[in-house]
Amino acid sequence: MQFSKMHGLGNDFMVIDGVTQNVYLTEELIRKWADRHRGVGFDQLLLVEPPYDPELDFHYRIFNADGSEVSQCGNGARCFARFVTLKGLTNKQDIGVSTAKGKMVLSLQDDGQVRVNMGEPIWEPAQIPFTANKFEKNYILRTDIQTVLCGVVSMGNPHCVLQVENIQTANVNELGALLERHERFPERANIGFMQVINRNHIKLRVFERGAGETQACGSGACGAVAVGIMQGLLDSRVQVDLPGGTLHIEWQGVGSPLYMTGDAEHIYDGAVKS
């Protein structure tokens, strides 16, 4: 089975064409391929499928390194767009895809970057899903080591965002692991640690559900900016610096879609036995 290795700001992917070849996946196979010493090594596996909706171009599926399937990955979406173009699966500049929880438009820019319409942020707790009686801009979450104030949003996947004074000293791995599996997140969550530099610039580290801390998390950057705007901390255009590089996020507020722009790089092509 043919695949490509790609990355978006160091968030790396095994990308498989399920349009022109038969694909057989199991959690065990995905975990085997994800092993960085004995396999391909990746944060997520991305699967390109024929469209479920005749008005769209493709269906987009995402699997974490632990084999679990998730409904969104922003960095992956940019790599998805670059992949289907490189492989000649489409010649469109604007590519319509469906995911497990919605639709997206992926736009190839003249400068080589990819702009993604991520849709509207979702704030209703039941739709995130998050256990709360009503939407609030800030929630209190208690763990064994720390009580935190955070914002919660879905970008097609659940995000919990907390503000920190210094991104370098933030307790990302220990606190992230506890919050990822907090009882109020029935489907677990991605945990963002956000340092606000000014109203147009943040630094961010993300502990991703099923993957741990990654070099970059596109949907996490979107979630952090959406929360920051809702909390009155940020303006509508924000530069997000992640360990792996920079993303640019735009959101005009409630009722508007959120846009993410960034790089997507092809590393190599390979083949595995399935």
UniProtKB/Swiss-Prot annotation:
Key words of the record: Amino-acid biosynthesis, Cytoplasm, Isomerase, Lysine biosynthesis
Signal peptide boundaries: none
Gene3D superfamilies given in the database record: Diaminopimelate Epimerase, Chain A, domain 1
GO molecular function, one term: diaminopimelate epimerase activity
Site (Important for dimerization) location in chain: Y268
Keyword Cytoplasm belongs to the record: yes
Residues with site note (Could be important to modulate the pK values of the two catalytic cysteine residues): H159, E208
GO biological process, one term: lysine biosynthetic process via diaminopimelate
Record's subcellular location: Cytoplasm
Pathway assignment: Amino-acid biosynthesis; L-lysine biosynthesis via DAP pathway; DL-2,6-diaminopimelate from LL-2,6-diaminopimelate: step 1/1
One annotated Gene Ontology cellular component of this protein: cytosol
Protein purpose: Catalyzes the stereoinversion of LL-2,6-diaminopimelate (L,L-DAP) to meso-diaminopimelate (meso-DAP), a precursor of L-lysine and an essential component of the bacterial peptidoglycan.
Subunit structure: Homodimer.
PANTHER family: DIAMINOPIMELATE EPIMERASE, DIAMINOPIMELATE EPIMERASE, CHLOROPLASTIC
Family: Belongs to the diaminopimelate epimerase family.
Protein name, per record: Diaminopimelate epimerase
Species of the source: Glaesserella parasuis serovar 5 (strain SH0165) (Haemophilus parasuis)
Name of encoding gene: dapF
